[in-house]
From Swiss-Prot:
The lineage of its organism: Bacteria, Bacillati, Bacillota, Clostridia, Eubacteriales. It comes from Eubacterium limosum. Methylcob(III)alamin binds at H103. It comes from the Bacteria. This is Quaternary-amine-specific corrinoid protein. Keywords: Cobalt, Metal-binding.
Amino acid sequence: MADWKNLTQAVGDLEEDDVMEILNDFVATNPTEAEAEEAVAACQAGMAVVGDLFEEGEYFVGDLIFAGELLTEAINVLKPVLGSGDTAVAGTILIGTAHGDLHDIGKNIFRSMAEAAGFQVTDLGIDVAIDTFVEKAKEIKPDIIGISGVLTLAIDSMKETSDALKAAGVDSKLIIGGNPVTKEACEYVGADDFTTNAAEGVKICQAWVG
């Protein structure tokens, strides 16, 4: 039985070598799928620590990006043991960067952290046309739609997208995120909530599907 506390701490401390050593040793013991899910849960707990430290100002954006990459690596090591991916999905999220905005670092961090928390994420990429958001939302009927943006112009794009989604009868929860996003912007867009912090954004999504 692996020591999950050590794994959680290693992820929280961003100790890549330690994380990989623990996981490779664990996989070598030919674990069951249920045990592998415990390993994923320990990694997720470590990601929550990273999110908290980021909120406290101990970690920076670069650390969050690294943590997301570390988590992807960890999940890849465990994939052969996790079987067909029958792990319970926390919920489904459709994300993309607002039309006219080409920034994706924040969105990518959010995607990594949401996937780590057990969400199934469909990422439409950057500069996503309003019609694309609407068509995909109608096709996959996600629990949550997330629109990110760094430029001030993204707010108007978010509003146009939000209006189009509502007009199309899409009733997914809508969260918007990025530097220019404020409570006022959230009300203007007609979103259910907003965040400027990927870790906090994931917590909001967890509360919605919890």
